[in-house]
């Protein structure tokens, strides 16, 4: 991690022990983010946990009123409750808030931002005609430093990316089936799938404290009644955030979620129907323009394992529908933790490169 940048770029990570928090710290280091200091914060029960930052030993600190003193950025990567209770504390301390939990997006108290779309999407309807709202402008061009930003989750990034790419070909309708991994429920989800898998293979009873259902060796269209948020609520949140981000600039796809029995990797099966079959090259170019990696003709389709550690969405060769001449199918997968963390760090990078107005 670079040093010598001073407190101006001091970074605080709330929820540092979570899967998102760990990935975020890793991405900051890998991308050589100019942070003079990284402070790891979490709930009191995690205080004192030994970890490392930039190859040096570091301890996770308990989150309190003074945690954000001198911080330039405050990333919220833990629970929604932590974000709801502490984002204004961070803001009052002068930090720019970047929320990965979805809490601020749900309450409408933040600006959602996917930097990869900066030069692709037109301004939102109703935007003032100014240099700050020209195509290619970012939220940093028109928001004060004290604004809170939401870095969308992987499901929203995947849904928006596919919708924006397909929009270039003016589809009549689009549908996306999303397959979230259990790591979207943090380490508890990973542990429950691992435990259920081992116990089922040994013919032992299984724990269902996270999903309130058998997720191992199974596909779920819904969780048990005791699981909160429910899968329907997760779907509604993704649909809401996708719709609000696209904001009339791109047709919003129909969305469905199916819980997959996989640890990592967010998969999607998308269908688009056009007035006439678009040239295959144009479809591929539309996705490539958004940084999506397309499998070559001789390469196998991407899967949850093959995309581990990759920062981009990967899609297979786009296939025509066998029954609908103007229909096309897209299969894609992304490393869910990395995709979300890279987006959040890119927001901070944009703000460092182009500081917002004071």
Segments predicted by a language model, with ranges:
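Charged docking surfaces used in two-component/phosphorelay signaling
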Residues: 2, 74, 184-358
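N-terminal Rossmann-like NAD(P) cofactor-binding subdomain of oxidoreductases
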Residues: 2-213, 250-252, 303-307, 313-314, ...
């Amino acid at each position: 991690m670079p040093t010598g940048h001073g407190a101006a770029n001091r970074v605080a990570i709330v929820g540092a022990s979570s899967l998102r928090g760990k990935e975020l710290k890793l991405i900051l280091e890998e991308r050589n983010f100019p942070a003079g200091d990284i402070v790891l914060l979490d709930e009191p029960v995690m205080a004192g946990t030994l970890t490392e930052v930039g190859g040096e030993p570091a301890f996770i600190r308990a989150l309190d009123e003074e945690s954000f003193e001198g911080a330039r950025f405050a990333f919220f990567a833990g629970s929604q409750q932590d974000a709801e209770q502490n984002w204004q504390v961070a803001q009052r301390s002068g930090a720019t808030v970047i929320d990965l939990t979805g809490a601020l997006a749900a309450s409408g108290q933040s600006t959602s931002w996917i930097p990869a779309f900066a030069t692709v999407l037109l301004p939102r309807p109703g935007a003032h005609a100014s240099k700050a709202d020209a195509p290619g402008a970012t939220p940093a061009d028109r928001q004060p430093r004290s604004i809170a930003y939401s870095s969308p989750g992987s499901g929203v990034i995947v849904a928006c990316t596919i919708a924006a790419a397909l929009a270039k070909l003016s589809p009549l309708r689009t549908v996306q089936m999303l397959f979230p991994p259990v790591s979207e429920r943090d380490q508890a989800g990973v542990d429950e799938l691992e435990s259920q898998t081992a116990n089922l293979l040994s013919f032992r009873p299984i724990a269902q404290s996270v999903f309130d259902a058998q997720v191992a060796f199974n596909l779920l269209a819904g969780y048990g009644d005791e699981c909160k948020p429910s899968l329907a609520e997760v779907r509604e949140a993704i649909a809401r955030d996708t719709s609000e981000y696209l904001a009339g600039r791109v047709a919003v796809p129909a969305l469905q979620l199916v819980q997959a029995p996989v640890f990592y990797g967010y998969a999607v099966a998308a269908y688009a129907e056009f007035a006439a079959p678009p040239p295959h090259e144009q479809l591929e170019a539309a996705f490539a323009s958004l940084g999506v990696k397309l499998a070559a003709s001789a390469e196998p389709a991407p899967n949850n394992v093959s995309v581990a550690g990759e920062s981009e969405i990967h899609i297979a060769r786009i296939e025509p529908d066998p029954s609908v001449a103007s229909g096309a199918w897209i299969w894609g997968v992304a490393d869910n933790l990395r995709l979300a963390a890279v987006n959040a760090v890119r927001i901070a990078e944009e703000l460092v490169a182009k500081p917002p107005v004071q």
